[in-house]
Design a protein with these regions (language model features):
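Conserved lysine of the Walker
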Residues: 13
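Hydrophobic positions on the alpha1 helix immediately C-terminal to the Walker A/P-loop
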Residues: 16
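A glycine- and Lys/Arg-enriched "phosphate-lid" helix/loop adjacent to the NTP-binding pocket
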Residues: 87-141
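Conserved nucleotide-sensing/catalytic segment adjacent to the nucleotide-binding pocket
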Residues: 27-82, 87
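NTP-dependent small-molecule kinase module
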Residues: 23, 129-160
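Hydrophobic anchor at the beta1->P-loop junction of P-loop NTPases
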Residues: 5
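Active-site signature of alpha/beta-hydrolase-fold catalytic machinery across serine-
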Residues: 19
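The conserved Walker
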Residues: 9
Length: 160
């Protein structure tokens, strides 16, 4: 089974995706791990798409966690199930703040070998703040996902 978990930053995609992959004993693929390089440098789109294609082709079954709208054609080409983690704004924001605080406090490296760690400054006070990103994108992501998961789409068995 090929599953893509989508949702706004802080909604719980990674936690849910890891649990599903573990329960099904299939590979878990985190798109952020494929995208982010050292010093928070993103991977160029052509390379990112090639890396994603390679990761998806490596196993007949997988759980993929991530949005990256520009990858939709690649990740949904053969997907069996799309799961949208549709949390309310307050809960999503709370989860994003809690996660960012925990990561900053523990100085946790997010993706091995990148050296990327969240800090209180980066998480709360910078233009690259994941908290600000969550606030800015929650509503637009929700509208996009509603359209993607709407009755007229191929994903018409919705459980919210």
């Amino acid at each position: 089974m090929k599953i893509n978990i989508i949702g706004t930053s802080g909604s719980g995609k990674s936690t849910f995706g890891r649990r599903i992959a573990e329960a099904l004993a299939i590979p878990y693929i985190e798109m952020d791990r494929l995208y982010w390089r050292s010093n928070w440098q993103g991977t160029p789109d052509d390379e990112f798409l090639a890396t994603l294609e390679k990761a998806l082709a490596a196993s007949p079954d997988w759980v993929l966690d991530g949005n990256y709208n520009r990858t939709r054609d690649v990740k949904w080409r053969d997907v069996d199930l799309v799961v949208w983690i549709d949390r309310g704004f307050i809960r999503t924001l709370w989860q994003a703040v809690t996660r960012a605080s925990r990561r900053a406090w523990h100085k946790q490296e997010l993706w091995p070998g990148t050296g990327n760690r969240e800090s209180f400054r980066r998480s709360f006070l910078s233009k690259d703040s994941i908290i600000i990103w969550t606030i800015k994108t929650w509503r637009s992501n929700r509208k996009r996902y509603e359209a993607d998961m709407g009755f007229e789409s191929q994903w018409n068995e919705n459980v919210r």
